[in-house]
Amino acid sequence: MSYGLGTENQNLPGFVVLQAGGARVPHGGVGLFSNGYLPAENQGSIIVGDKQPAVLNIQPRETDAAQRSRLEFVKGLDTDFVKSIGGNNDVEAAVRNYETAYRMQSAVPKLCDLSGETEATKKMYGMDSPNGVTAAYGHQALLARRLVESGVRFVELSCLPEKMGGGQAPNPWDQHGNLKGGHENMARQVDQPIGGLLKDLKGRGLLKDTLGIWAGEFGR
């Protein structure tokens, strides 16, 4: 999608994978949201919305001027290298990723700052739930709405592991025992946040331009 349509926000990746509350990358690793055969800027970028920093190494370690100078130096080296070999999509994509990462330093903290959201909105997403995993998934869902508002093309939410019979922590829906209890726990985790997200998107006029997909790899 990001490859075909591009991004509407130059300060954020076109594909974001959200985590919160201890959600993990599923079995299969980051290859599950890789760019495949597309340029590198089309791979998913993980944002952990309830931690600081939300993206590893996102906080600048030097002044903006020094960082800009360093970035231009590296870009110059990479550009000269690409010219010397007659073009290389991977290197060109890396140069574009440098620029995106530079701009994300200011964009990501603003994205993750929920102080401007009303308590009613947070409650709608279940962020006040006594069930911690519901609250954490609701945190992701609220960030998903903010990303959609910001023009990010593709947003993926991550389910949280729960204690249940037969389920493996990184793949909490992949259960092999106590299915009724385990699936009830998982449904309780995601039901209110997903409902809140759809209601919020509709109320803001965003749902008409947004496709929501809730899916797993099988229906055990």
Give the location of each predicted region.
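Ligand-binding pockets and gating/stacking loops
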Residues: 1-220
